[in-house]
């Protein structure tokens, strides 16, 4: 049977998506599925999440609650990150066959190294480090060459009513948010078992 692919709609600006990335990284090999991360800018969902605005106390409290539940240590940024260029860059990385390396590097840069992922120089340096042509990367991101792909990701997420961060698509339905690894293991394993039991076309 072909490997089961689970789409995950995310944004690098979301601390909860960083936590999800950490948990998915542990479960992907264990459960044998492939994650398909698709960037959707959180700033397009709510004006409260625009780059540079401070995270509201209610958002910080929610993040602290998830950190406590999941045990994933992370310091949320004081202000919403500017992730637009990084998301477009992820589509260039996908095209270059380097999505996983780029994706990992951007999450680490934003949440572990406190690098400004809204800075094109920083993004280009990351791209070059993982083997992407830096000149093409810079030029494409600067001109918004992948904006249409990011817009298509949002339209696709909307079709599933996947408006939260992160959103896992399990069949036709979104699982919104991130749970402790034990809960995620149970939910994803149950979905994979159901899929494996379905008649193959």
Model features per residue range: what roles?
Residues 18-113, 198-199:
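Structural alpha/beta surface segment adjacent to cysteine/selenocysteine redox centers
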Residues 2-33, 38, 108-201:
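C-terminal cap of thioredoxin/glutaredoxin-like
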């Amino acid at each position: 049977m072909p490997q089961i692919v689970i789409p995950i709609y995310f944004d690098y600006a979301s601390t909860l998506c960083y936590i999800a990335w950490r948990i998915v990284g542990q479960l992907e090999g264990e459960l044998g599925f492939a994650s398909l991360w698709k960037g959707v800018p959180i700033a397009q969902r709510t004006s409260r999440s625009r780059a540079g605005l401070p995270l509201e106390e209610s958002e910080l409290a929610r993040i602290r609650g998830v950190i406590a539940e999941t045990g994933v240590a992370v310091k949320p940024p004081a202000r919403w990150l500017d992730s637009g260029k990084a998301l477009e860059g992820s589509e260039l990385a996908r095209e270059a066959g380097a999505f996983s390396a780029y994706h990992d590097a951007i999450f680490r840069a934003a949440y572990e190294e406190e690098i400004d992922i809204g800075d094109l120089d920083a993004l280009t340096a990351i791209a070059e480090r993982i083997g992407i042509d830096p000149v093409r990367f810079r030029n494409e991101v600067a001109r918004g060459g992948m904006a249409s792909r990011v817009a298509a990701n949002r339209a696709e997420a909307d079709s599933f009513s996947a408006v939260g961060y992160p959103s896992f698509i399990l069949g036709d339905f979104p699982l919104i948010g991130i749970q402790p690894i034990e809960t995620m293991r149970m939910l994803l394993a149950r979905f994979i078992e159901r899929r494996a039991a379905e008649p193959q076309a």
